[in-house]
């Protein structure tokens, strides 16, 4: 989690329109806030920024399984590839893969006296442990005409959307905590939020290989496909005097 260091400026006289400002905000942004709050001239406010950073691991793994064979008779080559495809599909279903996460592609061609058939199965696993179990079964049980590829880890649209919401909400919570602590120091009470605005957001993903360029092992490879997101939120809170215990400056 990333926090931005800041100091809070305070107008000490309790006149209308007092504003407690976070030093991090730009002059341009200050002008925008003052304009926004001009209609609430009797409201004292405190303005802060809050930052957050969250990383999310992949939630899906795609495995490509290819089958190829060549025979003089078209029925023979078709039957040979089909039997292996059926075993691959059965194995995927036994490891809780739904039909919508399985894609099968076939290609048949003739080269002089031989018929060549190729097929590819793309399987999307949501359970990484079962993915490894399924790969092990296929590698052990099928011959060299079947090639089981390495898993490719990725993030679903749903997990990315959740990541963006989480980092935004955490940045707002950090801003609220910062404002609350500043109010305690100043002998004031934190009121309701008057303005919330996201000032910056970024996302980035890690490399799938280490610095030396060599392939990573299974667990580091999963970690290496992390997607990280940061958010910086600007929040304006109403500032209220503490009941029965207002500090004198």
Curated annotation (Swiss-Prot):
It is found in: Cytoplasm; Nucleus. The keyword Cytoplasm applies. Its main location: cytoplasm. GO terms for biological process: immune response; positive regulation of canonical NF-kappaB signal transduction. One of its GO terms (cellular component) is nucleus. The keyword Ligase does not apply. Keywords: Cytoplasm, Nucleus. Pfam families: SIMPL. May be part of a signaling pathway that leads to NF-kappa-B activation. Belongs to the IRAK1BP1 family. This is Interleukin-1 receptor-associated kinase 1-binding protein 1 homolog. It comes from Danio rerio.
């Amino acid at each position: 989690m990333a926090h931005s260091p800041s100091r809070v400026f305070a107008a000490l006289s309790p006149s209308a329109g007092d504003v407690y400002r976070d030093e991090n905000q730009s002059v341009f942004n200050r002008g925008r806030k003052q304009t926004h709050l001009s209609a609430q001239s009797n409201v004292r406010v405190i303005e802060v920024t809050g930052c957050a950073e969250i990383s999310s691991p992949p939630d899906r793994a795609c495995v490509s399984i290819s089958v190829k064979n060549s025979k003089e008779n078209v029925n023979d080559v078709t039957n040979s590839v089909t039997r292996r495809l059926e075993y691959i599909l059965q194995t995927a279903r036994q490891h809780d893969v739904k039909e919508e996460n399985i894609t099968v592609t076939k290609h048949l061609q003739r080269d002089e006296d031989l018929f060549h058939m190729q097929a590819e199965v793309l399987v999307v696993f949501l359970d990484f442990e079962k993915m490894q179990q399924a790969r092990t079964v296929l590698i052990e049980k099928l011959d060299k005409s079947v090639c089981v590829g390495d898993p490719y880890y990725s993030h679903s649209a749903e997990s990315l959307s959740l990541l963006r919401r989480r980092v935004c909400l955490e940045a707002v919570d950090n801003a609220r905590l910062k404002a609350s602590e500043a109010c305690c120091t100043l002998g004031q009470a934190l009121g309701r939020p008057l303005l919330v605005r996201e000032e910056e957001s970024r996302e980035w993903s890690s490399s799938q290989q280490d610095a030396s360029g060599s392939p990573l092992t299974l667990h580091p490879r999963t970690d290496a496909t992390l997607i990280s997101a940061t958010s910086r939120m600007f929040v304006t809170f109403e500032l209220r005097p503490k009941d029965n215990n207002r500090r004198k400056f």
